[in-house]
A protein has these predicted regions:
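Short aromatic-glycine-enriched beta-strand elements
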Residues: 19-32, 90
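Glycine-rich strand-loop-strand elements at beta-sheet edges
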Residues: 35-63
Length: 119
């Protein structure tokens, strides 16, 4: 079955490179994508959780910072987890295969995004 997604948005925070116990590079970050409803209507912003592994994670952490526009290509995946009360939860993430610059270095318009806890 087909499971492909391409998403462009601005990084809400600087991505941080981590390593698994076996030394594999990984980063997870959130991107903001404006949704435009039409002329004269206010834009709304959607936020997407993104995960990248290995050399893709290293590339993103080296060249992208908060506010930079990024375009990612990959697939959607679900991840199950338990909250503090022990309830089962599910998150949907974009698992990145490729990442691309979607702005020029001159366009360092960082943008003001609300903190994650403001949604």
């Amino acid at each position: 079955m087909l499971n492909r997604i391409t998403m462009t948005g601005r990084l809400v925070a600087d991505p941080e490179l981590r390593r698994t116990q076996s030394g594999v590079s990984v980063t997870s970050f959130r991107i903001a994508n404006d949704r435009d409803y039409g002329k004269g209507e206010e834009k709304e912003t959607d936020f997407f959780d993104v995960v990248a592994w290995r050399s893709t994670a290293e590339f993103i952490c080296k060249y992208f910072t908060k506010g930079r526009m990024i375009s990612v290509d990959g697939r959607l995946q679900t991840r199950g987890w338990k909250d503090r009360e022990g309830n089962n939860r599910v998150s949907i993430e974009i698992l990145v295969d490729n990442a691309y610059f979607a702005d020029s270095k001159k366009d360092d318009a960082a943008g003001d995004f609300p903190a994650d806890d403001q949604f």
